[in-house]
């Protein structure tokens, strides 16, 4: 089914008129989580196969008709055409993607747990710079970043909506100047923010004092 066909089907059956791509993406997040659970526990290192599996899980059913039908692109496969992105037009040519990605994986895996956050920042910035797939590079890149952090005993982080501008600026600093510092600093701040927010509302409710039981009715 194409996105258009599924949209029409869902609208007829349940009256849903929102974005079908959003439905796919939400379901795909769960599929990807299920895919990675055991790999995180086993601390499976990054590989071309793992990256393609993550991309397939996250983008199944989300390619638009131009990419899927006209350009012959497929989830889980490297791009067949150029899809430059950003004002600096980053992105490896299709015939260089696999070699560039293999080199990145080798670099990052060699670092291991020595500097997980800096290595994770480099992984993410360089992955987005390579732009290996026709679509979904941002989702895959952020998933791989957190996968890398977790297999190296570092907490995952969330890029919050209100911080997206700073996030894109940090990636742009790498694209323009190969300056990784802004992204490292951004991830440090987001890690603190993620875990601060995750513990909000989890403080125990104060127990009732004796006086509350002894008051006259």
Regions found by a protein language model. Give the residues of each.
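FIC/Doc superfamily catalytic core
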Residues: 1-135, 139-217
């Amino acid at each position: 089914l194409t996105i258009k066909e599924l949209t029409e089907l869902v609208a007829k059956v349940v009256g849903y008129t929102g974005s079908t791509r959003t439905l796919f993406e939400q379901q795909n997040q769960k599929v990807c989580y299920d895919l990675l659970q055991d790999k995180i526990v086993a601390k499976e290192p990054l590989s071309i196969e793992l990256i393609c599996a993550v991309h397939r899980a996250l983008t199944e059913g989300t390619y638009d008709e131009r990419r899927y039908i006209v350009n012959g692109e497929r989830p889980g496969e490297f791009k067949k055409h150029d899809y430059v992105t950003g004002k600096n037009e980053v992105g490896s040519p299709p015939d260089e993607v696999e070699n560039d990605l293999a080199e990145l994986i080798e670099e990052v895996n060699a670092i291991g747990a020595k500097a997980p956050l800096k290595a994770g920042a480099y992984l993410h910035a360089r992955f987005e710079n390579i732009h290996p797939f026709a679509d979904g590079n941002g989702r895959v890149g952020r998933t791989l970043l957190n996968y890398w952090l977790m297999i190296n005993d570092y907490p995952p982080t969330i890029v919050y909506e209100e911080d997206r501008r700073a996030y894109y600026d940090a990636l742009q600093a790498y694209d323009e100047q190969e300056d990784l510092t802004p992204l490292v600093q951004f991830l440090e701040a987001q890690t603190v923010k993620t875990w601060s927010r995750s513990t909000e509302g989890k403080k125990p409710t104060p127990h009732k004092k004796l006086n509350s039981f002894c008051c006259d009715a």
